[in-house]
Amino acid sequence: MMEELLPAETSSFPGPIPTQSVSSDEFTPPPQTVRQKQVEARIKELGDRLARHQGVSRRAFFKTAAGMAAAFVAMNDVYGPIFGASLAEAQNPDLANERAKALSGQFIMDMHTHFLRDDTRLQNFVRSREAVGKAGWNPALAGKPQTLEDLKFANYFKEIYFDSDTKVALISGSGSEEPRDWFLTNEMKAEARAKVNKLTGSQRLMSHAIFMPGMPGWLEAVDKAIAELKPDSFKGYTVGDNTNKQLSKHPWRMDDEKLLYPFYEKLAKAGLVNVCVHKGLYNLSTSQKFPHLLNHADVRDVGKAAKDWPQLNFIIYHSAFRFTGGEGKNGLAQFEQTGRVDWVTDLAEIPAKYGVTNVYGDLGQIFAQSTVAEPRLCAAMMGMLVKGLGADHVVWGTDAIWTGAPQWQIEAMRRLEIPEDMQKQHGFPALGPADGPTKRMIFGENSARLYKFDAKRRAELTTDRIALAKADYEREGPKRTNLR
């Protein structure tokens, strides 16, 4: 039964969007910035006023489409007109609900999601959620211990499929020199995919197999995964062990002909043409702590590999965004001074520099981090990627559920526009309306093309068991967990 996959709700919903950057596995949560405090205060002010006017509690208001609109109005009040949101929408529940309903069927493939294995010991993910409560930024978590259960399959299923407009997801993972610290084994990811798709009667979940070049027996593990698990694509981390960087003994380069090219040959032969590679998320403090891995975190090895293997697609996760963990201000300062952002600009320039058309940018934490911390930086990076890679080479991914239910990111993307001054100065194209061609490509059409998710499969999603169960779930009222 579908209900068996839904956990009991354990916390109330504090606000429509997060008002502070919170960690994934990459960094500890930074303190709120002055502007983030201003946004939070403005959201609370609007929430109090509009909730009273509509005759509901502020908490109830924040669970509505009008509450979501109010949050982006507050963002615009602080950061300037970056998001498409109006006070009229926030004041009129019918108008907000009509917009939300019209967009709810939008085809969204989130090809960058996570949950943790049942026997995980990675308590750092729990500590990151608790830190938010201790800091007082998220009332729902204040004084309430978080548990690893919040990061396991049942809550993943709920937050991805019921608390957001996501239609299809890909379960990713991360390997480690320490076997116990793999987020999920490759077998576990394949089992989750089979479980969900059998339950729903459609293809709602895809899965990665993680490859770890240089590890003993790694190519044999690739052969086994191809033969037995049939992953939808492979994913690797060029820094090696990203979870325990202090243990990383096998960093690698994408253009290492001796080490990687035999792997690419296996993928091409098997028809698994999508190679997903984690890049970036290597801020200045991490660089100082682990300098030996720094040269593996950027994108200097992408161009040659892409040129040498035109039959493969290289999808760079997080679009190589460097400035995580409260360092978004450094990224914005760099952009304002130079027009560049490490290492997103470098990635966006690869097609022109190398004459290739097989390099893609996954959003992941590039969007989750910058949307809340520095919206103008977010707009700038989206402009770079769409201009350099092409709108048909940028793919949606949220890194959920480290970031809670991804609906707030979906709404941010729907409403985001590159400011006119930025468009004129840098030649960035406009992103256009929520359901316009550019955002449709990014949300789902590009990944559908990459993974051959055809019209028949898309049609099945409208009448499968999730579609039916979600209709009942929404009638009972939303219970999103839009954490950051």
Where are these predicted regions, by residue range?
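C-terminal segment of N-terminal export signals and the immediately downstream linker at the start
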Residues: 48-56, 76-113
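Acidic (Asp/Glu)-rich catalytic clusters
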Residues: 158-165, 186-202, 222-231, 266-270, ...
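Active-site gating/metal-coordination segments in enzymes
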Residues: 175-297
